[in-house]
């Protein structure tokens, strides 16, 4: 039994280590991400609160319903999830969803792992 727990813990650690990083910024009233498309598999959202109040980051869809705790102003948090191909919603889950309703919501499209990556938008 102990050996199985160690193997499971190592597999989880390897999954986090190999996860594709997705930087996210939160501020009033938007979620900033370089792309709305990621490849299927483990994804680590690295979320930074650049706003003037607490925020939180949530991912929902295709069997995933997870998020961060409250992220204080100028602080960061990470969330690692395994995403299957499909469409997800990412949003700020603070309060009574008032942040989400104020515009802190966007769609995230997850493509199969072997699909070509979406082109990056040109730098402004």
Question: Which positions does each model-derived feature cover?
Answer:
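N-terminal edge beta-strand
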Residues: 20-40
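Extracytoplasmic/periplasmic copper-protein system
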Residues: 19-27, 73, 78, 82, ...
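Surface-exposed loop/edge segments in extracytoplasmic proteins
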Residues: 63-69
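Asparagine-centered strand-capping/turn motif at beta-strand->loop junctions
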Residues: 49-51
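A short tyrosine-centered beta-strand micro-motif
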Residues: 43, 86-90
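Short, flexible loop/turn segments at beta-strand junctions in immunoglobulin-like
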Residues: 37, 80-85
């Amino acid at each position: 039994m102990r050996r199985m727990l160690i193997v499971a813990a190592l597999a989880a650690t390897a999954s986090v280590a190999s996860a594709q990083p997705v930087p996210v910024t939160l501020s009033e009233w938007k979620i900033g991400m370089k792309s709305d498309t990621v490849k299927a598999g483990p994804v680590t959202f690295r979320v930074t609160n650049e706003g003037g109040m607490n925020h939180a980051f949530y991912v929902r869809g295709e069997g995933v319903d997870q998020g961060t705790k409250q992220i204080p102003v100028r602080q960061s948090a990470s969330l690692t999830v395994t995403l299957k191909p499909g469409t997800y919603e990412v949003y700020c889950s603070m309060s009574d969803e008032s942040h989400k309703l104020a515009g802190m919501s966007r769609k995230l499209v997850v493509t199969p792992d072997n699909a070509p990556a979406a082109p990056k938008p040109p730098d402004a």
